[in-house]
A protein has these predicted regions:
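Phosphate-handling architecture centered on phosphoinositide signaling
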Residues: 1-126, 135-136, 140-144, 148-149, ...
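Short, well-ordered amphipathic alpha-helical segments that serve as non-catalytic structural scaffolds
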Residues: 32, 133, 228-232
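Detector for Asparagine
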Residues: 32, 40, 80, 154, ...
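ATP-dependent phospho-/nucleotidyl transfer catalytic cores
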Residues: 127, 157-259
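Short beta-strand micro-motifs within the conserved protein kinase catalytic domain, predominantly
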Residues: 150-157
Length: 259
């Protein structure tokens, strides 16, 4: 298993380095053994305090280059530039034997520059719901993030009432959002927008990445020689988004909550 940090290093302008903040008496309570084996993750991570030390100790590999991502988005029909990872941290990327690269992302990791006065924590109730729901979606053949492991704690997190705190590590082929691109477009930081597109194409659309000025070619058919590649990649983006929308609508999936 090789842990890499391509997003954090290649797009350093789009992230903030954040040290994960542990909850008290953190305990590993659930592990997705099959997913860990798929990515050849070290078995000693999932015994006793192994992965907890990897995230939170000074010697641990997982927390050393943890970053929070900056992005914007639309809320209640209005553009909001003040979003970002308010309680989650990208720990790095790992690959399986087939070359598929997935992010490791810690949720409930504490405050970040994008927490907007929130505590950056997650509660047991919603964390368990996400853990089970993500795996259920995956095994139903519906595109989703995956649940790698979950931690419980006796530390109380205050919502409407005090609740037990929790954390989880989820995995996904990408944590890129439309809001990443929207933020740098609206802020007119076009150099960063170009770098973001380069990264996206290299990781997710390598055929298009081999073209001259691929990040521009994907969105603007300015050269006849690349027109077929452009159309194909736009078709793939549309196709993948359509698949997700179709199955979510069939299941009455609303606003990232499971009911």
């Amino acid at each position: 298993m090789q842990l890499s940090h391509h997003y954090a290093t290649d797009l350093s302008e789009t992230v903030s380095a954040v040290t994960p903040q542990p909850l008290s008496d953190l305990t590993l309570c659930l592990t997705n053994t099959a997913l860990a084996e798929q990515f050849n993750l070290p078995t000693d991570w999932f015994t006793d305090q192994g992965i907890i030390e990897q995230i939170f100790s000074e010697q641990g590999a997982l927390g050393k280059q943890a970053v929070a991502q900056k992005y914007g988005g639309h809320q209640f029909g209005q553009w909001n530039p003040y979003l970002g990872d308010g309680r989650g941290l990208l720990l790095g990327e790992v690959s399986d034997d087939k070359g598929a690269q997935f992010d490791l992302h810690l949720k409930g990791a504490g405050q970040t520059p994008y927490s907007r006065h929130a505590d950056g924590r997650a509660v047991l109730r919603s964390t368990l719901r996400e853990y089970i729901g993500s795996e259920a979606l995956h095994h139903l053949g519906i595109p989703s993030s995956r649940s790698l492991c979950m931690f419980t704690s006796n530390e109380r997190v205050y919502r409407e009432l005090p609740e037990p705190g929790a954390m989880m590590i989820r995995m996904a082929s990408s944590h890129l959002r439309f809001g990443h691109f929207e933020y740098y477009f609206h802020s007119k930081e076009f150099d960063i927008l170009d770098k973001l597109m380069d990264f996206t194409l290299t990781r997710h659309f390598p055929d298009c990445a081999s073209q001259t000025e691929p990040h521009k070619a994907l969105l603007k058919a300015s050269e006849e020689a690349t027109a077929s590649v452009i159309k194909e990649n736009l078709r793939l983006i549309h196709q993948e988004q359509s698949k997700i929308m179709e199955v979510f609508r069939c299941l009455h999936f609303i606003n990232t909550f499971f009911f």
